[in-house]
Amino acid sequence: MGGHGALTIALREQNDWVSVSAFAPVCNPTKVPWGEKAFKSYLGGVDSGKVHDATCLLNQKTVFDEILIDQGSADEFLENQLSPAALAEAAKQVGQNITINMREGFDHSYHFIAAFIEDHVSFHGAKLKAKLGTIA
């Protein structure tokens, strides 16, 4: 749930963040079995989960100059649970720049994150440096 949390917190509290990235996030939980089950059980219904759905939140407006997502092509949850295509479509609709790197052969494991974490650290570092440069 780390990627999903990163996206939804950043999209809801965009003034507190300079950038956002995620590894294999659940992008549209109100439309997939994991999210439907969780929102019905914990919030009383799927509609209550829309404030916790990155795709629904992104449908409202462009927030960041870019969002970075890495996704493994061999992730067993890709087709039925993660829905990066829904997030990409929402981004397109509001003009939000989004990079979704489909990493060939990688699954949903720690090895996947370890292989690409440096890219995410560099991404955030560059965004923070650019932001600080506008303040100075």
State each model region's role.
Residues 1-136:
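Non-catalytic cap/lid and distal C-terminal segments of serine-dependent acyl enzymes
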